[in-house]
Design a protein with these regions (language model features):
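Two-metal-ion RNase H-like nuclease active-site motif
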Residues: 1-9, 62-63
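Short, low-complexity Ser/Thr-rich regulatory SLiMs
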Residues: 7, 19-20
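Short glycine-rich loop/turn motifs
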Residues: 11-15
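Mg2+-dependent endonuclease catalytic cores in nucleic-acid-processing enzymes, primarily RNase H-like
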Residues: 16, 22-147, 166-170, 176-177, ...
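Histidine-centered active-site/metal-ligand motif
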Residues: 151
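Internal mixed-charge
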Residues: 155
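Short, hydrophobic alpha-helical segments
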Residues: 159-167
Length: 198
């Protein structure tokens, strides 16, 4: 299981739970809340992982602002999550433009199968994410509006940015069983296997 997030304390924080499959991802769950710190999120995420039937998490992808220290703990969110999940599990999404992340989201969403029940509020946010239109100039803004929809959308596109490279591609030619092969194909397979013997 892989998790991507957008962090916020006074703002909302959003968390997407991903499962790699051949050709894309099952998006299992979206969770969000506001006013919570890392110490509140860690047990909640661990509980969500258990509820989803996973034994552990492969990676948690966090935005670059996870490196900022807080006044309350004097530690970064990244450090707190590393303590809760392990050093090797926490990664920071590389800095790119929001436009690049949106493009990654547009590309990867075609390869995602969503649990409509557990992702309902996150999907609402993805549908509602929009650019502001300037009537006077007849153009859209360069960046989407920052509102309630930006939290699930940012969390989703952070995940898309790093996960688009890891999509498991289906085999070009599906394997044939012995009863589907011609006699010549069986002889060729046999020759190849014999040549690899010691």
């Amino acid at each position: 299981m892989i998790i991507s997030c957008d962090l916020g304390f006074n703002d909302a924080a959003g968390w997407w739970y991903w499962q790699p499959t051949v050709g894309g991802y099952n998006v299992l769950m979206y969770d969000y809340d506001h006013g919570l710190d890392a110490s509140d999120w860690i047990p909640r995420i661990q509980e969500n992982i258990r509820k989803l039937g996973a034994k552990n998490v492969g990676r948690i992808w966090m935005p670059h602002d996870a490196r900022a220290k807080t006044f309350q703990t004097k530690r970064t969110s990244q450090e707190q999550f590393q303590q809760g999940f392990g050093m090797d599990k926490i990664r920071i999404v590389p800095m790119t433009s929001k436009v690049d992340r949106i493009e990654a989201g547009r590309h990867l969403i075609k390869s995602c199968a969503f649990n409509r029940t557990l992702c309902d509020s996150g999907l609402d946010g993805l549908r509602a994410w929009e650019y502001e239109y300037n009537e006077d100039e007849g153009v859209f803004s360069k960046h989407p509006k920052h509102n309630w929809a930006s939290h699930p959308s940012d969390a989703f596109t952070y995940g898309c940015q790093v996960l688009q490279e890891d999509v498991i591609k289906p085999a070009d030619v599906p394997p044939k069983f012995w009863d589907e092969q011609s006699l010549n194909e069986l002889w060729e397979t046999n020759k190849r296997l014999k040549s690899k013997r010691i």
